[in-house]
Amino acid sequence: MRILITGGAGLVGSHAAEYFARKKWNVVVLDNLMRSQIFGYDKGSVEYNWRYLGQYRNIKRIKGDVRNENDVKSALGKGVDVVIHSAGQPGVPSSVRVPLEDFSINAFGTLNVLECTRKKSPRATIVYCSTNKVYGENIDKISLKERKTRYVYKDRAGIDEDMLTDLTGHTPYGVSKLTGDLYTQEYAHIYKMKTGIFRMSCIYGARQFGFEDQGWVAWFIIATLKNKPITIYGDGKQVRDLLYAEDLIRGYEAFINSKLQHGIFNIGGGHENTTSLLEFIDEIEKLLGKRPKMTFSNWRPSDQKVYISDISKIKKILGWQPKISVKEGIKRLSDWVVKNESYFS
């Protein structure tokens, strides 16, 4: 089997590349290594995953941009069996600062990958890495109850795939990812391509170089270890379901191996793998023996108070469920950060 993974140097992409390389697939990763320019952090950390993947002989690394037709066609080569499109601009605050760049990467980049794949590998399975942000502020219309350390849904366990995506605000990031989501659906309908759309909740794992704009799970651990201050936007009671990257990739694999022609799945840790920011900080203290320096600020636009994925659909249809608990996953990430402390300034 031959697989192309866009955004192969990112958290999701690098975990996917390693996962399938270990299964003896021929893996091609495409990445422009431009995260440092978008987010303004150290380029050395951006290239860590790129170098890490170099240890696998069956991973071919190509520096290129998903917006460039020639780059994508070159990565596709004579054809592939699977495309995992994880490349993207992943930060909500960044999308507000540079909306044109955000749209160019997330919307046009996705369309370019779809069209190039249609021309060179029309029978390939395409996995699109979408996001819960496609639901926008509709999430905030759900009734909540406030408890000591977290908010909880008043009358539901989680968000399913029938949640509305329109008639609400999204942020530029939510709009650009929804555009890619809809285009991927359309390529399934009009061109009969096999496509799986995974609307991800909070994904984390080893080799995650988090910072304030993106990757908060890793950022909180890194900041605590390096004695850097963190800002809590809101009251810290906001809740997310966490999913370790390896578990996410198993979900992709389940779809790839299935007979489904098209599917849309909310994917995350589900109601059994949730944490609030305040609870997460308590967990950090248990692991590192200290708490981060914290300040509180106003809520950020479209920052959902609670987002928990209803994963019953993917459980039923693909037989998938998380294996790595939040406690175990956070320890894995924390151990990796401590071991690689020198990479964090």
Model-derived regions, located:
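Glycine/proline-rich active-site loop of Rossmann-fold NAD(P)-dependent oxidoreductases
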Residues: 178, 191-194, 203-219, 226-228, ...
